[in-house]
Amino acid sequence: MNHSAPGIPPPPRRVRLKPWLVAQVNSCQYPGLQWVNGEKKLFYIPWRHATRHGPSQDGDNTIFKAWAKETGKYTEGVDEADPAKWKANLRCALNKSRDFQLFYDGPRDMPPQPYKIYEVCSNGPAPTESQPTDDYVLGEEEEEEEEELQRMLPGLSITEPALPGPPNAPYSLPKEDTKWPPALQPPVGLGPPVPDPNLLAPPSGNPAGFRQLLPEVLEPGPLASSQPPTEPLLPDLLISPHMLPLTDLEIKFQYRGRAPRTLTISNPQGCRLFYSQLEATQEQVELFGPVTLEQVRFPSPEDIPSDKQRFYTNQLLDVLDRGLILQLQGQDLYAIRLCQCKVFWSGPCALAHGSCPNPIQREVKTKLFSLEQFLNELILFQKGQTNTPPPFEIFFCFGEEWPDVKPREKKLITVQVVPVAARLLLEMFSGELSWSADSIRLQISNPDLKDHMVEQFKELHHLWQSQQQLQPMVQAPPVAGLDASQGPWPMHPVGMQ
């Protein structure tokens, strides 16, 4: 490693994160940085918050400082020490890299030894020097972002406080409280299943004991299973639409293109996206919406490395107390904006708006997605009557106009919402979905589809069978003359309208 002259900080340099970080874990020179299992797929990083946990006993001998020095962002005796920024830089690098995935985000109740667990992803052989890789570099691009952020505040879209009085359009949600079995309850906060925090206690002088606990959590279930199913799953899903995760929504938060949090919610009524310390209560339904909604808090901006970006992001989060409701009604998805912060969006039901900014009016129910419309367009696409597959992704932009000429990655706060059932159906017919046991998390939803939707699924199933005649594979069970009360999972008319 070449060193610059004394007193002159080295310029930002390209560093291949995966080999560097794996080597640091193997070196065992940083306290607490260690492999979780013998396969060296999961590793543990102590993740202290200086403002909440005080200074570390190990001083500045951390992997965060080492990364800052390796990337040329910190030089001993020249730059002022900034542990918070070092930590944010490494987290951003991990989030941007395709070689790592956050597996477990540690307990949420401020434990004495907070930590994260990352997974090393298998992306084939390591790239050579001439091949593209997920290098991490800091330089001119971030400096340009700083200048752009400095001019941003006057253009942030924040409304004046709403005047007292009834909302423009009333909204209501189903009152029934659906109970889900614990085994089917999805984690809130991460895409992969989250192990029990009580079993994932941080090591305290006994790393061996910590490793003995983890396999008991990690081995069972879909993460450890890689055997392909003995029968094709797709025909069963189309025969029995209630096997599709109709209430599942994938939600991805992004702060200027960096994703601090991705999660899946399965509440049959929907969710509320908000940022506040105030809890929704039954007595404050008019302020925060029904308490039966999944309450999803925006990620903290504390790990944003840029001071200016963090400042402006906080300006918007401060007026997101009441939040944005995503309401599931029948087979449609709606948005109800309660917050003072303006919200703009794009999605399947907004195509007519083109590239012009598309705001969500405050306290007015706005239709975002229709499963019936998606199924009709999917059938037309599969028959070759349309050239493009039906869209299903929904994007929200908070406090800035969208769509416009500015790319989404440059917006302060964006949220992507994906109806999981639509994504699965499209992937089934495009051949993009790998039907291994760990590729789909099946859930049973209430069979509340309308009668004509059953006909749409039967037509999709017929198209699927036609495709399979072109290639040899295990045949699905015969479905001739099938009606809604037949098949391996019979559909009953309970709940249909």
Curated annotation (Swiss-Prot):
Q: Which residues bind DNA?
A: 14-122
Region feature (Disordered): 124-178
Q: Which domain of life is it from?
A: Eukaryota
- Gene Ontology terms, cellular component aspect? cytoplasm; nucleus
Glycyl lysine isopeptide (Lys-Gly) (interchain with G-Cter in ubiquitin) crosslink residues: 410-411
Localization (cell): Cytoplasm; Nucleus
Task: Could you list this entry's UniProt keywords, alphabetically sorted.
Answer: Antiviral defense, Cytoplasm, DNA-binding, Immunity, Inflammatory response, Innate immunity, Isopeptide bond, Nucleus, Phosphoprotein, Transcription, Transcription regulation, Ubl conjugation
**Motif Nuclear export signal per UniProt: ranges:** 149-159
Alphabetized GO MF terms: DNA-binding transcription activator activity, RNA polymerase II-specific; DNA-binding transcription factor activity, RNA polymerase II-specific; identical protein binding; protein kinase binding; protein serine/threonine kinase binding; transcription cis-regulatory region binding
The UniProt entry annotates the motif Nuclear localization signal at 12-18
What modulates its activity? Maintained as a monomer in an autoinhibited state. Phosphorylation and activation follow the following steps: innate adapter protein TASL recruits IRF5, thereby licensing IRF5 for phosphorylation by IKBKB. Phosphorylated IRF5 dissociates from the adapter proteins, dimerizes, and then enters the nucleus to induce IFNs.
One GO term (biological process): cytokine-mediated signaling pathway
Give the observed phenotype of the deletion mutant: Mice develop normally and no overt phenotype is observed in hematopoietic cell population. However, the induction of pro-inflammatory cytokines, such as interleukin-6 (IL6) and IL12 by various TLR ligands is impaired, whereas interferon-alpha induction is normal.
Entry-linked Gene3D superfamilies: 2.60.200.10, Winged helix-like DNA-binding domain superfamily/Winged helix DNA-binding domain (1.10.10.10)
Bias class Acidic residues marks the residues at 137-148
Q: What is the effect of changing residue 445 to A?
A: Abolished homodimerization and subsequent activation
Modifications the protein undergoes after translation, according to the UniProt entry:
Phosphorylation of serine and threonine residues by IKBKB in a C-terminal autoinhibitory region, stimulates dimerization, transport into the nucleus, assembly with the coactivator CBP/EP300 and initiation of transcription. 'Lys-63'-linked polyubiquitination by TRAF6 is required for activation.
Q: Does Cytoplasm appear among the keywords?
A: yes
What is said about its interaction partners and assembly?
A: Homodimer, when phosphorylated. Interacts with TASL (via pLxIS motif); interaction takes place downstream of TLR7, TLR8 or TLR9, leading to its activation. Interacts with MYD88 and TRAF6.
Q: What does the similarity note say?
A: Belongs to the IRF family.
Q: What does this protein do?
A: Transcription factor that plays a critical role in innate immunity by activating expression of type I interferon (IFN) IFNA and INFB and inflammatory cytokines downstream of endolysosomal toll-like receptors TLR7, TLR8 and TLR9. Regulates the transcription of type I IFN genes (IFN-alpha and IFN-beta) and IFN-stimulated genes (ISG) by binding to an interferon-stimulated response element (ISRE) in their promoters. Can efficiently activate both the IFN-beta (IFNB) and the IFN-alpha (IFNA) genes and mediate their induction downstream of the TLR-activated, MyD88-dependent pathway.
Protein name per the record: Interferon regulatory factor 5
